[in-house]
A protein has these predicted regions:
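Conserved N-terminal beta-strand and adjoining loop/helix that marks the start
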Residues: 1-20, 90
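Short connector loops at helix/strand junctions that flank enzyme active sites
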Residues: 4-6, 14, 32, 37, ...
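Conserved Nudix-box catalytic region and its N-terminal flanking loop in Nudix hydrolases
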Residues: 18-58
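A short coil-to-beta-strand element that immediately follows conserved catalytic motifs
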Residues: 62-71
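Active-site-adjacent beta-strand/loop module that shapes the phosphate/pyrophosphate-binding cleft
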Residues: 74-99, 112, 116, 135
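NUDIX/MutT-family hydrolases
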Residues: 90, 101-134
């Protein structure tokens, strides 16, 4: 039996008492229109910390530093039910491009800095609100 799996990382970017949430593109196959933090798969040769920094920059244009691991997760995704294991990092933004506006990739249609404790009105994947509530 093969033990192949992919490693995923998630960046919860916290600035003061807010976290950055991104609205998934309606073209996304998985959870279109849901709100989530930056996330993606780790590339060959990367550490989880390097991957979360890269993913945050690719999806938002923000330079971040990982502060600590908040959570670990495991799931199956897609028609082939690819197995993923991953880590959710609390990250702090270091600087912003331009005037501090988030620069979105094609994966998302909107970005919002949401106060901790006010995420209930946002449609999210199971478990994410629990992680965010623990930060409040």
């Amino acid at each position: 039996m093969s033990a192949k799996f992919a490693v995923a990382v998630t960046a919860i970017i916290k600035r003061d008492d807010t976290v950055l949430l991104l609205k998934r593109s309606p073209e996304k196959a998985h959870l279109p229109g849901y709100w989530d933090p930056c996330s993606g798969r780790m590339e060959s040769g990367e550490t989880p910390e390097q991957a979360v920094v890269r993913e945050a920059f690719e999806e938002t244009g923000l330079d971040v530093t990982p502060v600590r691991v908040l959570d670990t997760f495991h799931f199956y995704y897609g028609p082939q039910q690819e197995e993923f294991v991953g880590m959710t990092f609390l990250c702090r933004p270091l600087c912003h491009r331009g005037d501090g506006e988030v620069v979105l990739s094609a994966e998302h249609t909107e970005a919002r800095w949401v106060k901790l404790g006010e995420v209930d009105g946002y449609e999210m994947a199971d478990g994410l609100k629990d992680v965010l509530d623990a930060l409040a």
